[in-house]
């Protein structure tokens, strides 16, 4: 008896497992899993824009976004206005539901760019424990940036 999608992997669960691996320090293994999923949907054997599980455009594959959050170490509290990001040098995407942008981390500097919306910050924390508490909350407006030195 042919079963629709009977031989398809559940990509959403693969992304979830990969994200867990990132949080456990297994970044290379996680990258291997994500690469395997993306290779499966290469446009030759499967549609690269439709990771089918239980029908077309099934939402569970959206779990892939959780890997971005895990790799960047991003967390934002709208209550305390704390912006947390990885201490690893690089350029990282962030999004908090009301605004989005990127943060560039280099040694002891963090530059936060807001591409859409506005972002209120009181504390900037790196995931290595270093943080900068501002004397007063500041708001970074859309299409603006602020650079912070964290010692």
Q: What spans do the regions from the language model cover?
A:
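Non-catalytic C-terminal accessory modules of carbohydrate-active enzymes
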Residues: 3, 7, 14-144
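Surface-exposed interaction regions enriched in Ser/Thr/Asp/Glu
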Residues: 146-151
